C-alpha cells in the first residue's frame, strides 16, 4: 500500500497526520542508516534472507538428526547381532550340559543296577561258601544254592 502525495495517514494515538511523502522520507532515512553503518551492527536482514537461512539451518538440523538416528539404528543392529550370537553360544552350552547330564544319569542308573546285581551275586557266593563249610548235608545245600 503506497500512498501518493495527496493521501494522508492518520495516526490513531495522537491524531497527527503523516503524508505519503513523509512515510517515503522516513523509509529512505532508515535505509540510508543501514547502508551508512560500516560495521554491520543492527543491520536489518531482509525477510527472504532470514527465511532462506532458517530453511538451510532446518535442513542441516534434520540431516544431523537423520544421521544420528541412522547411527543409533546401526549400533542397535550390531548389538542385536552380537546378542544373537551370544544367545546361540549359550544354547549350545546348555544343550551340551543337558547331554552330559543325561549321560551321567544313565551311567548312574547302570551302575546302580550293576551294584544290585553284584550284591545279589555276592550273597549267592556267600551262601555257597557257607554251604561248603558246613559238614551236614553239604550236597543238599549245594543243590539248593545252585537252584537259586
From Swiss-Prot:
The keyword Nucleus applies. SUPFAM superfamilies: Leucine zipper domain. It is found in: Nucleus. Residues 76-90 are annotated as: Leucine-zipper. Keywords: DNA-binding, Nucleus, Transcription, Transcription regulation. InterPro entries: bZIP (IPR004827), bZIP_sf (IPR046347). One of its GO terms (molecular function) is DNA binding. It holds the Pfam family bZIP_1. It comes from the Eukaryota. One of its GO terms (cellular component) is nucleus. Residues 48-97 form the bZIP domain. Residues 50-72 are annotated as: Basic motif. Probable transcription factor involved in somatic embryogenesis. Acts as a positive regulator of BHLH109. PANTHER family: BASIC LEUCINE ZIPPER 4 (PTHR45764:SF52), BZIP TRANSCRIPTION FACTOR 44 (PTHR45764). This is Basic leucine zipper 4. It comes from Arabidopsis thaliana. The gene is BZIP4.
